[in-house]
């Protein structure tokens, strides 16, 4: 001890030397005050940890047993203490707030009132614990009225949380000023931690436990009690997922399973929406339910902003028709807009669909812990076991005390004359008490009960009542002792009581659970873009764009057309193709490279606009141009046919290009001086028809060609004269005819039967008579009677005509005028518009 004091004195001397600038400390040392030097880092660490644990345990996180934070528990206990229950009149909220602050929660009144308000909001709590009267806020984020205006009382369900609290079922601790006792936890006759969930941010941790359906939560507890080895999949058949007060649809089965298995996971909550038609045939998106904790007003304002900023197009009007009966928001869709696409955009860009992270963090034994679903159920079941046991012990003690009194009264009544004699002979109460105890071997309590007994109890009827009551109490005692000796009876009582709560207060599930995965609920670009028919247009200077198909109105054969592209003086239309916006667009260059992108990735432009430079979209080299393009929906095992300017043809499977990117890959190995001219898809192995610009063609069977790899250069299709080159390639489909068009706008249809199938390598036969009047062939394609043609000239004029208006003539004919070309203008390309199969459109 002397050695220790010596060390402290030495320490104080050192401290005095180091604190010459602190006269207060130096003075304390001189006065003999004990000063203990500490490291500031250690002190800050200890103080912060103390504060953190105070926040974690005493403020921000719920107790796993009753699902309540301290402030919620204090509010409910204060209201119960003052008997402000469901069978009593409403009480001013100000009075409740004052009671809680004055006796249990010495903090700001706003914190207490906000707690009250939340427990009364039907859109915040799955099962409200406070019955509020007045304005308690709204799903639009409106604040509740001041507490001087509102009134409240406990709900019947809240009373189930407090039931049996007077029977020593839970522990109590002193309040802040040691004037009252407050419960450390409530008896909780239902699993409130699951039913109403909890949200809170502590120091370094946070909890977000979703609410659940009361019936399902109760059934899950019962199932666990009856089968402690129950598996999580079995539990999830009973309790499939959260049940939010605002309804909606839960998406993310994997995330939900993960949350229940580990205590942490993520789901998505989607609004419940219908798409209906009004009397005018216009589509309306009707929102009935929104995700949990979403502010409806803010959500609608966000939608309005997206519409005003033209991020979402196609919405004409937004109406909020919500009332006391529920939510109803109508989003009116414009005539030509796609309601499903708009809805997908709303899901992606607004809180019509939200991500909800689950962290089931709660307090157990004064320590924070992340619970799995099964652990929560076990903790609650153990809590209820303790409550039932303590309640039974309390009732047993009370019954035993009552039996003890009744036994004394029975003895007195059986010896009433002697009792009266003893009492009359006694000088005072104490002597009478002692005499009775000595004569009949009674306890002090029994003697006092006899002395306090009224004379009316001496009637024969009252005597029998005492005897009957004693018998009933003895039966009760035996039953209570049996409960305490048999754990199975305790389990049975817990299950029975839970079942009664479920039967009295349970209701149907409001939130649907979708089997979609989280990945399937995320929206890719295609979900947000309408799958519409468009025209893909490419100019000589490699500017590309897409236009709505209805940009080009139908005209009679021989019309002048409409302006289809605004070009510079030296820029002209090169290629044209019809497509759907969700199609894949494969581009092939003269150098034999292939590029892949989606049609919707092309810029939308007007008829007059040039579009976007293709070099800004794909990786084209300076000496490289696109000579062919075609669209298709999906990669499959069908074949592509490629034809070069010098008459070589190559067959290759489409799925060889699945890894094609915008950077490009080799599609064909070209011979010196040759270029790739055209590419088509031939999924059904039809005969192939290849035509030259000088009007010669060859028809061959596809089986003559073997499939080759991407780097192969192909084989000879037809022998060409020096001044000739390939105009195009098409497939001979059933119920189709050959269509060809020449530079000066003459076109015709010819029956494929006029062309016999021959082997490759020949010079070909005439399919179009060419001359100065009609010019050389521009391109060929197979067409059906119901198809339409979109023809465009070098200057950008476009005409859309029906195939059936074009005459069927022989293979040596020149054809009829399809489009009237002006001086120095000529047909550059055409596209087939086929409603039934846009994928097969060729140019």
Swiss-Prot record:
- Comment field (misc): Few gyrases are as efficient as E.coli at forming negative supercoils. Not all organisms have 2 type II topoisomerases; in organisms with a single type II topoisomerase this enzyme also has to decatenate newly replicated chromosomes.
Superkingdom? Bacteria
Protein purpose: A type II topoisomerase that negatively supercoils closed circular double-stranded (ds) DNA in an ATP-dependent manner to modulate DNA topology and maintain chromosomes in an underwound state. Negative supercoiling favors strand separation, and DNA replication, transcription, recombination and repair, all of which involve strand separation. Also able to catalyze the interconversion of other topological isomers of dsDNA rings, including catenanes and knotted rings. Type II topoisomerases break and join 2 DNA strands simultaneously in an ATP-dependent manner.
UniProt lists the family membership as follows: Belongs to the type II topoisomerase GyrA/ParC subunit family.
**Reaction(s) catalysed by this chain's protein:** ATP-dependent breakage, passage and rejoining of double-stranded DNA
Name this protein carries in UniProt: DNA gyrase subunit A
- Where does the record place the catalytic residues? 149 (o-(5'-phospho-dna)-tyrosine intermediate)
Q: Where in the cell is it found?
A: Cytoplasm
Quote the EC number: 5.6.2.2
Q: Cellular component per GO?
A: chromosome; cytoplasm; DNA topoisomerase type II (double strand cut, ATP-hydrolyzing) complex
